[in-house]
Amino acid sequence: MTKPEAQPPARVDPLTGDAYPTPMLELSTRERRQVQFASGDVTLAGELDLPRSPETAPLVFIIHHSGPVTRDAYGYLAELLTSTGFAIFRFDKRGVGASEGVYGCCEAEDALAAYRAAVTQQGIDRGQVFIVAQSIGTEQLAAHFEEFAAIQPPVGVVLLSSLLGPELIAAIAAPVHIIVSDSESNLDAISAQAAAAHQQQWPYGATYYIADHSEHTLFDISDEPIDWSDPVWVQRYHRGAMQSMIDWMRNINEN
């Protein structure tokens, strides 16, 4: 009898109690590159995951949701994206994981420093860079979009769990795809109204996708609420939402 493949151990965040399974990237990556970079007077740690492709790959850069999270919070995205040909850059927030400093400050500045480090890496197609921001990260991106674009203009922006209404989204001068949960209280404002406002402001195009039966961070709660202390949460990402993101980025990459 063949023994089942052992699963990597979960890492439990001592600050939040959340369990972050180690992503299983061996089959979908040719390299997992550890990257250290400076932000102010501290050194932060990130990781570039390159897909199994002999050519340079389009890059997806992640701007985190709120909380003292590490790169492992987006391990499920690394698995999905590298398996479909995208490189992905994730990093540990200040004061957590392998990053120095004290958690609780400078998140926008740290995201800019991480972006600067990400787009200079070998193995990525600098002309095909996407920014994927989630929740509070969408506000950070909107507030500092000109600074991100000065480093490298993104060919597209995906707003996961977007907090941006019609006024704030106008700051993002790039093609935009909005993905939000159907459980949001202001759903129309952050989806249809936001997309319409962006279309009125810019010629790039804006689309949106509403993830049914999901919670704010786009995990499926059709059957029961998410237990973030149980590593199986990582398997409950909303399939439709993530496929919507991949399809949209592929379309831009091919056109």
What would you call each of these model-derived segments?
Residues 81-98:
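Conserved alpha/beta-hydrolase
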